[in-house]
């Protein structure tokens, strides 16, 4: 029998294709070229692997022969050799040629070797060194560990095993077996201590997003580690049985709330079925995944191009997921699994990212290049340039605008052409963009007036939507003067959510409220828009049962902004018009409380002055604001304030705010404004604004 196997094995070796790189067949392994390994009892191999694998799959003939002869260990050994030499699938997200590892990835790999310090995104025992928390307890691993005051996100991400891929890269680069030994020890421990729940998904280890992430990583881990002497037939059987169980779980439990998690789940299933076709259920995994992706690209991307969760962070993520699914299908001759019009919604979705990228993206070394509305945070220019826009150009090579974004970012040499400066209205999502150019010195105002939909219908603290309809960000000449407060932290069930609540507070955004109470409804409605020398957008939201906020924004000669805000309804109490400024010292961001406004005095002469006027007496109330650029519980302080008015039930609160960008000192700037209509009208408003001696009459009629 052994001699027959030797002849067959040599023939297979001679006629099989090349592995991913030349050393794949020359390193590692535990098979002597002349002999099979010493026999081991059947019970060292998980017998379920032979139930999960399709023994009739081409290339598994020896596996089937050994299995039917009752030689389970030799069958598993033949299966391992099959995986080491197979060339029947292609993972476009993985290359084993000249693998490199970053300093950050190396640190994650090494920290995991000592006291089980497992990397969990944005959670560190020492933020300076990015040292992870240790989950070691009584000599073992406590998979239920969560640092003090950490949000639910820690437990969720712990079970995504974010340090495994760095360890795999470290192994591939160094050849040091300690990395695979750590992986096997830890993953085996995880399997033993986190069995699949009998009742379906839980909120931590077996939540759909965690399972999806693990599946996506495991197809890579197999390739990185498979030639190690420590990757034994016994371990392969354990690994494959667990892989099949997790993929089957995703088929059985589609994420009911849809959104980005369902897309991640579908992508994982498509990946599992495509790259692991040897499993009996591979076709089911693949078909389920591609079917969901085909449906959800239409269901979740609205007609204006926005993803229904209306968070730019998740929007960018789902476009990347759809792109990866498309590339996976193409690389494995499975494009027919996706509809021919699969990319049509993705074009608009890619253009959303383009229009929501601030022009400092084109400055070499600049960060914080996108707005942070809802559960979203700033993104570095390198991620957009080297990953996202690169993918968009690959999908849409005919787009000269996307080509410009991909090439000109981070100080690059521009190709293609700049997008136009027209007002962009994303009415389905409730976002409106006003701009005067695409150079770093340009001005861009983005306004948020979201409306609920079937994927984003809650303003509860755990949702990705913040109760901030009417808010805005304003970028000018390299500086975001009114950045969103950010997220800071995710929700914690039954825990301390003070930071989560604070950053979601409506007065921590640039909009109107009553008594600083969060709105109850997100039902943004676009009422009017006009283009021309002076651009206009008018929108409203019935955020409370008895109070509606209407905001009209005039972009006067594309030089300065006039905001007309009205609190409409029979609500009575204190109306708060809130403004949250950029970071700066007290001498750089200066409150002008007596003038109901603020001005900046930055040394680079890039400044603004803000003044608010009203239809009755108001007071200016400064407070210490906050801004968070990540979701790690950390934040910086900044200057914020509210313009407060006491409103009776029969009154409409009316404000005029002028925001004037200034090149130099604001000392000589003069601003005044007043209403020139006869009072609140359901269909119109008219104001007179004087800026530096020049008077402008601004009005709209619905």
Curated annotation (Swiss-Prot):
Top-level EC class as recorded in UniProt: lyase
Residues of the signal peptide: 1-17
Pfam family, one: Hepar_II_III_N
Superkingdom, natural source: Bacteria
Record GO terms (molecular function): heparin-sulfate lyase activity
First-listed, main subcellular location of the protein, grouped into a coarse class: periplasm
This protein's record includes keyword Lyase: yes
Keywords: Lyase, Periplasm, Signal
InterPro entries assigned: Chondroitin_lyas, Hepar_II_III_C, Hepar_II_III_N, HepC
SUPFAM superfamilies: Chondroitin AC/alginate lyase
Residues forming coiled coils: none
NCBIfam families: Hepsulflyase_bctds (NF045572)
Biological role: Specifically cleaves heparan sulfate-rich regions of acidic polysaccharides. Does not act on N,O-desulfated glucosamine or N-acetyl-O-sulfated glucosamine linkages. Functions in cleaving metazoan heparan sulfate and providing carbon, nitrogen and sulfate sources for microorganisms.
Similarity comment: Belongs to the polysaccharide lyase 12 family.
Name recorded for this polypeptide: Heparin-sulfate lyase
């Amino acid at each position: 029998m052994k001699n027959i196997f030797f002849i067959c094995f040599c023939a297979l070796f001679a006629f099989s294709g090349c592995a991913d790189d030349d050393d794949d067949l020359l390193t590692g392994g535990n098979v002597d070229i002349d002999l099979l390994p010493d026999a081991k009892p059947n019970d060292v191999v998980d017998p379920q692997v032979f139930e999960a694998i399709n023994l009739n799959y081409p290339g598994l003939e020896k596996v089937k022969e050994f299995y039917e002869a009752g030689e389970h260990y030799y069958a598993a050994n033949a299966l391992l050799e099959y995986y080491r030499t197979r060339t029947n699938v292609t993972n476009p997200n993985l290359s084993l040629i000249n693998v490199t590892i970053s300093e950050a990835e190396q640190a994650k790999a090494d920290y995991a070797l000592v006291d089980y310090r497992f990397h969990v995104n944005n959670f560190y025992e020492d933020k300076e060194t990015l040292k992870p928390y240790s989950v070691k307890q009584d000599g073992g691993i406590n998979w239920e560990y969560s640092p003090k005051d950490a949000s639910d996100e820690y437990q969720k991400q712990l079970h995504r095993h974010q340090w495994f891929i760095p360890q795999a890269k470290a192994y591939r680069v160094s050849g040091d077996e300690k990395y695979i030994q750590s992986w096997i020890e830890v993953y085996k421990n995880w399997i033993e201590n986190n069995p699949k729940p009998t009742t379906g998904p839980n909120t931590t280890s077996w939540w759909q997003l965690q399972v999806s992430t693990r599946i996506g990583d495991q197809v890579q881990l197999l390739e990185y580690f498979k030639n190690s002497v420590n990757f034994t037939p016994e371990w392969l059987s354990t690994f494959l049985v667990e892989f099949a169980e997790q993929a089957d779980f995703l088929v059985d439990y589609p994420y009911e709330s849809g959104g980005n998690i369902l897309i991640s789940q579908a992508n994982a299933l498509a990946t599992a079925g495509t790259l692991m076709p040897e499993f009996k259920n591979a076709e089911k995994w693949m078909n389920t995944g591609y079917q969901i992706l085909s449906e959800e690209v239409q269901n979740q991307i609205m007609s204006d191009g926005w993803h229904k969760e209306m968070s730019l962070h998740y929007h960018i993520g789902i476009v990347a997921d759809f792109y990866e699914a498309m590339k996976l299908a193409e690389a494995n001759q499975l494009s027919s699994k996706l509809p021919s019009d699969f990319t049509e919604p993705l074009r608009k979705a890619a253009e959303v990212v383009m229009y929501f990228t601030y022009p400092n993206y084109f400055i070499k070394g600049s960060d914080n290049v996108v707005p942070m509305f809802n559960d979203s945070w700033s993104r570095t220019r390198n991620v957009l340039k080297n990953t996202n826009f690169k993918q968009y150009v690959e999908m849409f090579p005919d787009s000269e605008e996307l080509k410009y974004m991909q090439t000109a970012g981070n100080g690059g040499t521009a190709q293609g052409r700049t997008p136009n400066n027209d007002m962009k209205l994303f009415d389905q999502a409730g976002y409106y963009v006003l701009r005067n150019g695409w150079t770093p010195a340009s001005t861009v105002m983005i306004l948020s007036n979201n409306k609920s939909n079937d994927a984003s219908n809650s303003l509860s603290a755990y949702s990705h939507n913040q109760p901030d309809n009417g808010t805005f960000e304003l970028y000018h000449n390299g500086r975001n003067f009114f950045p969103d407060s950010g997220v800071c932290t995710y929700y914690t069930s039954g825990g301390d959510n003070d930071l989560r609540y604070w950053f979601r507070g409506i007065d921590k955004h640039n909009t109107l409220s009553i008594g600083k109470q969060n709105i109850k409804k997100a039902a943004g409605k676009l009422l009017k828009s006009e283009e021309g020398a002076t651009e206009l957008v008018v929108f409203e939201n019935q955020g409370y049962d008895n109070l509606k906020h209407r905001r009209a924004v005039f972009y006067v000669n594309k030089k300065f902004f006039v905001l007309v805000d009205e609190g409409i309804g029979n609500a009575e109490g204190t109306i708060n018009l809130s403004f949250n400024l950029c970071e700066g010292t007290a001498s750089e961001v200066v409150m002008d409380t007596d003038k109901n406004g603020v001005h900046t005095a930055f040394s680079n002469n890039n400044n603004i002055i803000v003044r608010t006027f009203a239809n009755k007496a108001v007071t200016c109330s400064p407070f210490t604001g906050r801004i968070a650029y990540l979701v790690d519980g950390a934040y910086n302080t900044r200057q914020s304030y509210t313009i407060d008015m006491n409103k009776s039930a029969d009154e409409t609160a009316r404000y005029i705010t002028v925001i004037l960008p200034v090149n130099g000192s604001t000392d000589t700037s003069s601003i005044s404004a007043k209403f020139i209509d006869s009072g609140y009208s359901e269909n119109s408003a008219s104001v007179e604004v004087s800026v530096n001696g020049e008077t402008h009459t601004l009005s709209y009629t619905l």
